[in-house]
Amino acid sequence: MTDLRHYDVIVSPSITEKSTLVSDFNQVVFNVARTASKPEIKAAVEALFGVKVTAVNTLLRKGKTKRFRGFAGKQKDVKKAIVTLAEGQSIDVSTGL
């Protein structure tokens, strides 16, 4: 049985041009919770998708400053995780959990 906390760690898959390029190197990119640590991300991916994770790299993308109707606002900061999978394993991120 999957722990419900794993669903709080993984927010969504990140489908971008760069994330499709790193899929050739057996890597998958996820948007994750800002408070999530690398061991929590590794445990969540292994539990939810049933794969073996060899490495987790994280980055924090700062939100851009935008103007809306004359007022300055700021987009949210987003934490991303680049998850490297073991040889021969893959995740189909186009299907839901």
UniProtKB/Swiss-Prot annotation:
Disulfide cysteine pairs (residue numbers): none
One function term, GO molecular function aspect: structural constituent of ribosome
Pfam families given in the database record: Ribosomal_L23 (PF00276)
Alphabetical UniProt keywords: Ribonucleoprotein, Ribosomal protein, RNA-binding, rRNA-binding
Top-level taxon in the UniProt lineage: Bacteria
CC per GO annotation: ribonucleoprotein complex; ribosome
GO biological process, one term: translation
InterPro entries the record matches: Nucleotide-bd_a/b_plait_sf, Ribosomal_uL23-like, Ribosomal_uL23/eL15/eS24_sf
Family classification: Belongs to the universal ribosomal protein uL23 family.
Subunit record text: Part of the 50S ribosomal subunit. Contacts protein L29, and trigger factor when it is bound to the ribosome.
Entry function: One of the early assembly proteins it binds 23S rRNA. One of the proteins that surrounds the polypeptide exit tunnel on the outside of the ribosome. Forms the main docking site for trigger factor binding to the ribosome.
Protein name listed in UniProt: Large ribosomal subunit protein uL23
Organism listed in the record: Allorhizobium ampelinum (strain ATCC BAA-846 / DSM 112012 / S4) (Agrobacterium vitis (strain S4))
Upper lineage: Bacteria, Pseudomonadati, Pseudomonadota, Alphaproteobacteria, Hyphomicrobiales
